[in-house]
């Protein structure tokens, strides 16, 4: 009887292990290879890709380019916010602004965030400077309706600060998360990038959070859907990240963490969200349920470590500095 019981336990253990391995293996649904590179020759210094309501594309490459504007057929039209012909620095790079993020509003005005100068500059479609807002430690920028602009910061008491048309603060929301007893660690781990949708909602993607998370907010700042990567295949990386937090907790040196969530984008039609974790691409429905997981590659078969992601109805535009921006067929729209 004991022998039969032992065999049964062993059989069940093997069955459970097989099921577990099957679940983990099933998480990677496919390997996606880009169809082609777009917006050539931009690549080095790539920071952001945006699609305006006017049909134009806006590609931020820094520090030497500025915001390059392309038409619907991906032909370059002009450059906005290009650095002035300044004296190169000792490293041989052009002087001038260092754009880290950008966005475009319904009127075609472009907002460029400069982390070095602590400025968010609004530029007209012809490149004329309309206004500049001084922001302490800006990280990401998003244009909102009615002339408002949202900025995420590294040093603020809230995650998001919204400025009105006059440049004054009109509201703040989002509380930094508690990961550590050290305030500087909590601030860094709460750092995030911004995105929007046509309904005026704002999305906050935590760059360094152990469990990758993009949180949806309405325009007033009330939290909505959480798009969070959890599960068996997310556990090892999250566990390693939390161990690193504990390790740095006891150090007296400035904290440093490797980015986990590197890009995200929202489907303007459905509200579904796509999230990039370096070479891994995750797809969520509008309710925050994870649908699929992919590995992404260039047409030449090189790993694509995404730092920009733009979702369109029939394709994904995914970019990496310095490789450039690539066109992917949407796997959920394959016929």
Task: Tell me the role of every PLM-derived stretch.
Residues 2-12:
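Bacterial N-terminal signal peptides that target proteins for export
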Residues 22-335:
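Eukaryotic scaffold repeat domains enriched in small/polar residues
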Residues 10-20:
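Bacterial N-terminal signal peptides
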């Amino acid at each position: 009887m004991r022998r039969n019981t032992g065999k049964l336990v062993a059989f069940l253990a093997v069955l459970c292990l097989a099921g577990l391995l099957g679940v983990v293996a099933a998480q990677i649904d496919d390997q996606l290879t880009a169809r082609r590179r777009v917006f050539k020759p931009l690549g080095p210094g790539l920071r952001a890709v945006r699609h305006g309501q006017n049909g134009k594309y806006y590609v931020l490459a820094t520090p030497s380019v500025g915001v390059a504007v392309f038409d619907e057929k991906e032909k370059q039209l002009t450059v906005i916010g290009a650095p002035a012909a300044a004296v190169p620095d000792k490293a041989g790079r052009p002087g001038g602004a260092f754009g880290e993020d950008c966005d475009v509003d319904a009127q075609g005005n472009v907002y460029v965030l400069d982390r070095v100068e602590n400025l968010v500059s609004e530029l007209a479609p012809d490149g004329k400077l309309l206004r500049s807002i001084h922001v302490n430690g800006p990280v990401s920028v998003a244009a909102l309706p009615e002339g408002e602009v949202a900025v995420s910061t590294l040093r603020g008491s809230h995650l998001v600060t919204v400025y009105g048309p006059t440049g004054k603060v009109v509201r703040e929301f989002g509380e930094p998360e508690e990961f550590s007893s050290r305030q500087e660690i909590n601030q860094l781990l709460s750092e995030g990038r911004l995105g929007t949708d046509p309904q005026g909602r704002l999305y906050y993607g935590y760059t360094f959070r152990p469990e990758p998370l993009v949180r949806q907010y309405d325009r007033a700042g009330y939290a909505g859907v959480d798009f969070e990567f959890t599960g068996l295949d997310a556990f090892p990386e999250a566990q390693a990240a939390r161990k690193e937090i504990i390790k740095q907790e006891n150090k007296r040196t400035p904290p440093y963490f490797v980015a986990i969530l590197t890009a995200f984008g929202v489907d303007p039609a459905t509200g579904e969200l796509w999230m990039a974790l370096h070479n891994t691409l995750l797809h969520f429905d509008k309710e925050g349920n994870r649908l699929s997981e992919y590995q992404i590659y260039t047409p030449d078969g090189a790993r694509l470590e995404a730092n920009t992601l733009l979702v369109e109805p029939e394709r994904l535009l995914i970019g990496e500095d310095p490789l450039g921006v690539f066109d992917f067929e949407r796997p959920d729209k394959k016929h």
